[in-house]
């Protein structure tokens, strides 16, 4: 089953990298968007700007601050292995 990764809208380079690795990527516009994700990637500029950390999701949240798209992909993969 394909893992669903939620990302913030400003992370379009990460979106492409994750899609190339076979993940189903969705843009998180509201905290509700994070609820069905297997993992969430946020910018970290304001760690809770969308309320992602407060949602009922049990998915891991990765802060992308200072990381390349490849590094973020590696972190996502670590969460599932």
From Swiss-Prot:
Transmembrane segments: none
Highest taxon listed in the record's lineage: Bacteria
Pfam families: UPF0180 (PF03698)
UniProt feature coiled coil, ranges: none
UniProt family annotation: Belongs to the UPF0180 family.
Name of the protein described by the UniProt record: UPF0180 protein RBAM_013970
Natural source organism: Bacillus velezensis (strain DSM 23117 / BGSC 10A6 / LMG 26770 / FZB42)
Lineage: Bacteria, Bacillati, Bacillota, Bacilli, Bacillales
